[in-house]
From Swiss-Prot:
Residues 1-39 are annotated as: Disordered. Transmembrane segments: none annotated. It comes from Hyphomonas neptunium (strain ATCC 15444). PANTHER family: 50S RIBOSOMAL PROTEIN L15 (PTHR12934), LARGE RIBOSOMAL SUBUNIT PROTEIN UL15M (PTHR12934:SF11). Residues 21-35 have a biased composition (Gly residues). This is Large ribosomal subunit protein uL15. The lineage of its organism: Bacteria, Pseudomonadati, Pseudomonadota, Alphaproteobacteria, Hyphomonadales. One of its GO terms (cellular component) is cytosolic large ribosomal subunit. One of its GO terms (molecular function) is rRNA binding.
Amino acid sequence: MKLNELSPADGSTKKRMRVGRGVGSGKGKTAGRGVKGQNARSGVAVNGFEGGQMPIYMRLPKRGFTSPGSKNMSWVNLGRIAKAIEAGTLDASNVTEESLVAAGVVRKARDGIRLLAKGDAPQKLTITVTGASKAAVEAVEKAGGSVTVTGAPKDAAEE
């Protein structure tokens, strides 16, 4: 059996009905749309219109807001950095946000890159990032490396 030999099971599909092609077809004249009214017209769909009933998007309350000071950070795990170093696309002695983007480890730096602890830390890794989790910093330092965090530290109130 090949992909080009596959076909639907017998009786599982119906032929498409061509409507509005004469009274004898059974779906002529009004073409299954009934008589007059908004639904009989072409271009009927008005997005969000529910026939005069208060639409769902107006019945429900507005919620939340977008914080003006929020940061949209990219993130990278230690395991992903270790793979890139093994593949030879990253130099473990000097890893920066620019080198992570250039090596394809992170697609975009956005408002900075945050280092997370999933995976094993490579030996003697020296990395400079905007943010890092406590577990990631501990893992890198335990493996004999160092982490430099350039971003502002979190406020005590935020933790």
